[in-house]
UniProtKB/Swiss-Prot annotation:
It comes from Azorhizobium caulinodans (strain ATCC 43989 / DSM 5975 / JCM 20966 / LMG 6465 / NBRC 14845 / NCIMB 13405 / ORS 571). The keyword Glycoprotein does not apply. Keywords: Cell inner membrane, Cell membrane, Cytochrome c-type biogenesis, Heme, Iron, Membrane, Metal-binding, Signal-anchor, Transmembrane, Transmembrane helix. SUPFAM superfamilies: Heme chaperone CcmE. Residues 1-7 are cytoplasmic. Heme chaperone required for the biogenesis of c-type cytochromes. Transiently binds heme delivered by CcmC and transfers the heme to apo-cytochromes in a process facilitated by CcmF and CcmH. This is Cytochrome c-type biogenesis protein CcmE. The gene is ccmE.
C-alpha cells in the first residue's frame, strides 16, 4: 500500500466517523426539539396526537374557564382557535386578549394539555409567526410602537386610590 492510498483511507474513515457522529447528534436533538405553532397551523397540519408543541397566540376573550387548580382557555391567532387545558398556577400577567405561549402535548380531541403557560410581559411583543397570522386575518392593530394592541390592553387598569402627595406650605421666617 502506498502512502497516498493510506492517506485517502485515513481521510475517508475520519469523514465517515464525523458523519456518523453528526447523524447521532441530530437524531438525539430531534427527540428534544419542540416546534412553535400557531392555532391555524395546528388546525391545518396533520399533527399526530401525543406530539409536543408550543402554541402561541392571544387568549380568546370569554374563553377562560377555571375549575379549582385547573383552567381551560382558547388560544387564537384570529383565524383558528385551539383549546388549552392547564393545571397549576397561571402567570400574573395572564388575562383575556393577552399574548400567551402554552407548551404541552396535543391530545386526540385537538386540545393541548399544557405543562407550562407563559404570558407575554409586553402586549406589543408577539412572535413573528403569530404576528403574521394576525396581519393576514385582519386582527392586527397598530399600537404605539407598531405592535398589536389586544383588547385587554385597551381598557384602563385600576386607578390608584392613593392621594397625591401633600405639598407642605413654605415657612416664612421673621
Amino acid at each position: 500500500m502506498t502512502r497516498k492510498s493510506r492517506r485517502l483511507i485515513l481521510i475517508g474513515a475520519g469523514l465517515g466517523v464525523l458523519a456518523l457522529a453528526a447523524g447521532l447528534i441530530l437524531t438525539a436533538l430531534n427527540d428534544t426539539i419542540v416546534f412553535f405553532r400557531t392555532p391555524t397551523e395546528v388546525a391545518q397540519q396533520q399533527i399526530a396526537p401525543g406530539a409536543r408543541l408550543r402554541l402561541g397566540g392571544l387568549v380568546e376573550p370569554g374563553s377562560v374557564a377555571k375549575s379549582g387548580a385547573s383552567v381551560r382557555f382558547a388560544v387564537t391567532d384570529g383565524n383558528s382557535k385551539v383549546t388549552v387545558a392547564y393545571t397549576g398556577l397561571l402567570p400574573d400577567l395572564f388575562r383575556e386578549g393577552q399574548g400567551v405561549v402554552a407548551e404541552g402535548v396535543l391530545q386526540s380531541d385537538g386540545t393541548v394539555k399544557a405543562d407550562s403557560v407563559l404570558a407575554k410581559h409586553d402586549e406589543r411583543y408577539m412572535p413573528r409567526e403569530v404576528a403574521d397570522a394576525l396581519k393576514k386575518s385582519g386582527h392586527w392593530k397598530e399600537g404605539e410602537e407598531g405592535g398589536p394592541v389586544p383588547p385587554a390592553a385597551k381598557t384602563p387598569g385600576p386607578q390608584s386610590s392613593a392621594a397625591p402627595p401633600a405639598v407642605s406650605p413654605a415657612r416664612s421666617t421673621p
